[in-house]
A protein has these predicted regions:
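Short capping/connector residues at structural and topological boundaries
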Residues: 5, 9, 84, 147-148, ...
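A structural "hinge/loop" feature
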Residues: 1-4, 29, 79-91, 120, ...
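N-terminal lobe/hinge region of extracytoplasmic solute-binding protein
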Residues: 1-13, 41, 118
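Short aromatic-glycine motifs in intrinsically disordered, low-complexity regions
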Residues: 106-116
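Surface-exposed binding/hinge segments that line
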Residues: 9, 18, 52-102
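Short structured motifs
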Residues: 2-6, 53-57, 120-122
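Extracytoplasmic/periplasmic substrate-binding proteins
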Residues: 92-96, 110, 138-139, 146
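Extracytoplasmic/periplasmic ligand-capture domains
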Residues: 13-16, 20-51, 59-62, 114, ...
Length: 213
């Protein structure tokens, strides 16, 4: 289901996107083409982790408040798929908080956006302590609430590095959900009342290359 972009069309020199109207950021600011242009230009910055994914984009053009065009330096039929990794920021919020450019991980920089955010999604970030706890609460003004009704009002995300400790927290009821439980623990989890496991096939290939030279 399309989200911030409702439709998109290809042309010889790029892609044109029609943006969803009526979307607001968590602080109430309107989502417009200006935010999309800002976010893509930010993603192209040298310190950005996403610059390789959008490197074929040579320019971002505003057609109107809810239409933008990504001009590419050549044909790129899979660009829309790549764009799912580029997150749209509120340009006004970013400028007000001095995060017009991405943080520089190589220089161990930490900016305001490391612990704060202002998105458009169903959950609002209330607090974040990296490697400790992130707390999110339901966004009462989310544009997609009628299409994707949910039943969760608050999320507490606690990173637990040790797999055994993570599974123990699940079995004791300390946490409600864990990602990627160890294979050897799946049967024990499935045998516990109130717990279920979900598995999916991974979309990847693993190969061994033999040096025959």
């Amino acid at each position: 289901v399309p989200e911030l972009a409702e439709s998109w069309t290809a042309s010889p020199d790029g892609w044109t996107f029609k943006l969803r109207k009526g979307v607001t950021f968590h602080d109430g600011a309107d989502f417009t083409a200006e935010d999309v242009v800002f976010s893509f230009n930010r993603a192209l910055e040298e310190s950005s982790d996403y610059k390789e994914q959008v490197k074929t984009v040579s320019k971002v053009e505003v057609i109107d408040d809810y239409t933008i065009k990504l001009v590419t330096d050549g044909a790129n039929p899979i660009l829309p798929n790549t764009l799912t990794n580029v997150y749209i920021m509120d340009s006004g919020w970013a400028k007000a908080n001095g995060v017009e450019k991405p943080q520089d991980f190589a220089a161990e920089e930490e900016t305001f956006s490391v612990r704060n955010s202002n998105g458009t999604g169903p959950f609002m970030l209330m607090s974040r302590a990296p490697e400790e706890l992130s707390v999110l609460e339901r966004n009462p003004n989310w544009w997609g609430d009628s299409m994707f009704p949910g039943n969760v009002d608050r999320i507490e995300y606690r990173p637990i590095k040790n797999a055994a400790t993570r599974v123990a927290a699940l079995l004791s009821g300390e946490v409600d959900f864990v990602l990627d439980a160890p294979l050897q623990d799946l049967k024990r989890i499935e045998a516990t009342d109130g717990l279920t496991t979900k598995t999916v096939a991974q979309v990847r290939s693993i190969f061994f290359g033999m040096d025959q030279g």
